Amino acid sequence: MNAKKRPVSFYENDYDISEFDEIQVPQHIELAGYDKIHYINTMYPWEGHEYRRPAGTCNHIGEGMFSEASYNPTGSYVRFFDLEEALIGKRVILSFEGAEQAIYVWINGEFVGYAEDSFTVSEFDITPYVKETGNRLCVEVHKRSTAAFLEDQDFFRFFGLFRDVNLYGLPDIHVSDLWIRPKCALDGRQASMEIELKTTKGKTASYADARAEICLLDGHQMIAKEEVSVSESFRADLTISEPVQLWNCDDPKLYQVEIRIFDGQGDLIEIIPYQVGFRTICIEDGIIKLNGRRLIINGVNRHEWNAKSGRCISENDEIYDIECMKRNNINAVRTCHYPDRTTWYYRCDEAGIYVMAEVNLESHGSWQKMGAVEPSWNVPGSVELWQDVVLDRVKSNFEMFKNHTSVLFWSLGNESYAGEVLKEMNAYYKKRDPGRLVHYEGVFQNRDYEDNISDVESQMYAPPGRVREYLENEPKKPFILCEYMHDMGNSLGGV
């Protein structure tokens, strides 16, 4: 239903939904038989139909933009639920793993929040609104929003709740953030681990006498242990007395971190298991090195895709893709052009697949018009108005995947030109996580920023001669061909 004709008050507790249809979640609304399926490459889908320009780039941005647009399909979801017994009395979190493209959320008639960024988990604390029984969850999903200027990827344009929606409960003291930083010598003979933790607590809970027990195991063998007091923010340093085995694509050795939280009465209230590996990544003498050796990348770009269900994929789809990659000696993947399901990164850790973790950003239609480079109103570019919203996507990507050994590169996005905002994105990663490399191809289109954005020279579809020319003329950076053959449908014959 178009935004202007949507049932505006559907979230009210007494609103009659007897005329509503049923839909499976997760699922794209289009593949449930509503709206039209659109496939678009570089242009924004409204070009030629409605005039729109991003905020901060032109005096006139278009009448009504998306909320009053003549075409902006909207899905109104209603779900009734009771709390499971295990959630009663706990802080309750509502989690959307993927919602395209913008959502408004209500619980029992009360507005809970709004979220954009289709491919990043959005979570809401619904404790003040939820009851033990008879809850009414309402979600309004808009196909287009201001986020549309940043999500112009070359793919089918869907909308809806296309990943899982979950409820989970928090204990009285909960580890809300965890950063595990393994450190090792190139031969693995010396190793240590820094772990930073942040916690939240319930209104009646106390940190008094609460403690954390942190263990590092190799299989069933304990190789390091530390016990520390719990507070809102604390850390633990593990010293490892024996050599460790380094992680790589041929032998993706993982160790087990186990964190146990005890309250002031000595009761165990939370256990956090995590698998991590020891490895190093750096650039030395113009060469990318993993564990001190030259890194050889045999990689692919991977969209999340199932021929029947679109970007609504299953665990079996992920397992099939991993097995296919290993069969074909593929050792690296770029999450083009958005964060994947969180389970994918764990699979890459276990399988030894090097990951280039990409931010959900592509603004192709703002700087390339009908094939010509014309960046007069590109976003995010150097438009300060867009900086915070883009940095939010950068931070989300970092916080979600910072503990994954397989992530060697942070990628700033895809085909979004270059400017001061991309420069700030690069700076965020370099300051926050200097132990990884940053990738971005867009500076190829704007060389003014090649010294401030990306640790590597990245190009797309370059013929071998152009690659050779770059490498033979005192290259500033290592070269990565981040895309080399467009494989869509029954294609890839050019390889």
Regions found by a protein language model. Give the residues of each.
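Short strand-turn-strand beta-turns centered on an Asx-Gly dipeptide
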Residues: 106-112, 217-219, 291
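Short hydrophobic alpha-helix segments
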Residues: 113-115, 226-228, 272-274, 298, ...
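N-terminal carbohydrate-binding accessory modules
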Residues: 179, 258-327, 346
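Accessory beta-strand-rich segments of carbohydrate-active enzymes
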Residues: 1-2, 6, 28, 32, ...
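Substrate-binding/catalytic cleft of secreted carbohydrate-active enzymes
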Residues: 323, 332-495
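Accessory carbohydrate-binding/adhesion or oligomerization-edge regions at the termini
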Residues: 1-56, 136, 140, 217-219
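Surface beta-strand/loop "capping" patches
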Residues: 172-202
